[in-house]
């Protein structure tokens, strides 16, 4: 005869409730679970990482969506909405003036005009989210040139945005861009990366359109230090010609940019210049998220429902 006593209510196996509107992300189920340390993230949402010399001079990661890095350990930063210093770098190569993008009304548009419009919408929307955000505008021909200094007034940035012309460019000096930013920008430092929020973060958004030219870059120690900084992010929107003949070439260039992200915290997008302009705008809209609060790019989902398949026509643009 079984004389064992029935289990008390507290001894029963913890049975989690489904994620519902009244129970977001299983909030009530976390009461009995061990809490994470201050400033830590859930698994898969870590921020900066440190490894011994993770950035060789030549880097390549052959993937369109870089997976989270497999590193020995990751530095986790507080998920705070601190001010951003956003440096928007716009490529002015002749490819940007090609009339191949499909605009919203069915006519053809060039990448420069579409980029100018989406940059203005991005700056104005970020300003509405947090008026402490600051923006700077850099244009790139053969060399990078600082066009507008840091300002929290969107009108100052937009006033410099539209009087631009494309040029025939031989190469893109990415090293010169990094040096220019290091000269003009002070990177924040905190006593404890995991628990103390930074006063601000620095982010570059590079809009690049040179299918046959890989940027010239010789990584110096200062550049490696900048790329490994937990408060620095290097987002890229790469506009390529989309031709099958040059597919391997533009994929190599995209892999080059992916390989610069040793922390796995930056976002990289590739867009065909023969596709819809909506796709280009959607990429910029996805960059509205604060870099300290967004997940790894491979973990990001933009559908309202998990089973809903993502389609360009159904996405929301700013």
Swiss-Prot record:
A GO-annotated cellular component: BRCA1-A complex
UniProt main location, coarse: cytoplasm
Keywords: Cell cycle, Cell division, Chromatin regulator, Cytoplasm, DNA damage, DNA repair, Mitosis, Nucleus, Ubl conjugation pathway
Record region (Disordered): 1-67
UniProt biased composition (Basic and acidic residues): 9-18
GO BP annotation list: cell division; DNA repair-dependent chromatin remodeling; double-strand break repair; mitotic G2 DNA damage checkpoint signaling; positive regulation of DNA repair; response to ionizing radiation
Compartments it resides in: Cytoplasm; Nucleus
Segments of this protein annotated with the region VWFA-like: 86-287
Subunit and partners: Component of the ARISC complex, at least composed of uimc1/rap80, abraxas1, brcc3/brcc36, BABAM2 and babam1/nba1. Component of the BRCA1-A complex, at least composed of brca1, bard1, uimc1/rap80, abraxas1, brcc3/brcc36, BABAM2 and babam1/nba1. In the BRCA1-A complex, interacts directly with abraxas1 and BABAM2. Component of the BRISC complex, at least composed of abraxas2, brcc3/brcc36, babam2 and babam1/nba1.
Described purpose of this protein according to its UniProt entry: Component of the BRCA1-A complex, a complex that specifically recognizes 'Lys-63'-linked ubiquitinated histones H2A and H2AX at DNA lesions sites, leading to target the BRCA1-BARD1 heterodimer to sites of DNA damage at double-strand breaks (DSBs). The BRCA1-A complex also possesses deubiquitinase activity that specifically removes 'Lys-63'-linked ubiquitin on histones H2A and H2AX. In the BRCA1-A complex, it is required for the complex integrity and its localization at DSBs.
Domain commentary: The VWFA-like region is similar to the VWFA domain. Its presence reveals similarities between the structure of the 19S proteasome and the BRCA1-A complexes.
Family: Belongs to the BABAM1 family.
Protein name: BRISC and BRCA1-A complex member 1
Annotated organism of origin: Xenopus tropicalis
